[in-house]
Amino acid sequence: MSERTKRSVGVLGAPFSKGQARGGVEEGPIYIRRAGLIEKLEELEYEVRDYGDLHFPELPCDEPFQNVKNPRTVGQAAEKVANAVSEVKRSGRVCLTLGGDHSLAVGTITGHAKVHPDLCVVWVDAHADINTPITSPSGNLHGQPVSFLIRELQTKVPAIPGFSWVQPSLSAKDIVYIGLRDVDPGEHYILKTLGIKSYSMSDVDRLTINKVMEETIEFLVGKKKRPIHLSFDIDGLDPSVAPATGTPVPGGLTYREGMYITEQLYNTGLLSAVDMMEVNPSRGETERESKLTVNTSLNMILSCFGKAREGFHASSLRVPDLI
């Protein structure tokens, strides 16, 4: 990567909620910014360009397709995100997308792949989000984005309204899941049939997060260096540290494990795009829970950009000599 790519970040807000049923997740971007995101990235010596928030008009009469809800609204929003992410990547910046619900990963990854078609993905989540429109129990598109992206699944994914623009950009060997603990039967079948590398929380417990990250990095970029896209659903973390999200699942990654994942991805020097998804301040039962979730998401983001738990100092800092 160029020096500018390593030290320059483009922040893109995606305040969108129609991939699932719970309102409030569209407020994620503004809350994360208010927590000091831009200033803290600048303290890490990044040149930051804030591209602002995308606008997502709600389409009237967006009838379900079979049981898939809001297909045209979600498809249009994801396409807008894809175009915006491509613009950020063409500028040479690392792209940070603030969601919004996880259906938008169809857009973030497709947009990234337009510029870096050899990318790979680390997907941190309690859920696999790889249901097809046919296997999805709920019909919510935030549980389906990966199915649109995987080439080996395209004979299983029907043409649904709003998604004709999507071209699959990943093979099954290009993605690794970390943190799974609520996987639907159809998703489990897909993961096992395609041999997609995934680490459930049982695997994390058994191997430790250090081994999980060693294996993940070796699998994705050990033989060939290529851009890494981190798509981070905040519900990958345990509800004790990130309660304000739409579908929390007990028994998740600890704060320390989340930090270790992001630190190790930063240390590769290959992290090219980051999604922070499903932060929903309205789902906190108290103001403290909402603030805790926002601050946790902020710290995960900053760790992606080099904030180390051991401390940090500006390159210009000097301890003055006594006169």
From Swiss-Prot:
EC number in record: 3.5.3.1
Pfam families: Arginase
Pathway(s) per entry: Nitrogen metabolism; urea cycle; L-ornithine and urea from L-arginine: step 1/1
Annotated catalysed reactions: L-arginine + H2O = urea + L-ornithine
Cofactor note (record): Binds 2 manganese ions per subunit.
Keywords: Arginine metabolism, Hydrolase, Manganese, Metal-binding, Urea cycle
GO terms under biological process: arginine catabolic process to ornithine; urea cycle
Residues the record lists as binding Mn(2+) 1: H102, D125, D129, D233
Gene Ontology terms, MF aspect: arginase activity; manganese ion binding
Keyword Magnesium recorded: no
Keyword flag Transmembrane: no
Cofactor(s) essential for the protein: Mn(2+)
Residues at which Mn(2+) 2 binds: D125, H127, D233, D235
Enzyme type, top EC level: hydrolase
Gene Ontology CC: one annotated term: nucleus
Residues bound to substrate: H127, A128, D129, I130, N131, S138, G139, N140, D184, T247, E278
Subunit structure, interactors included: Homotrimer.
Family: Belongs to the arginase family.
Name of protein: Arginase, hepatic
Organism listed in the record: Aquarana catesbeiana (American bullfrog)
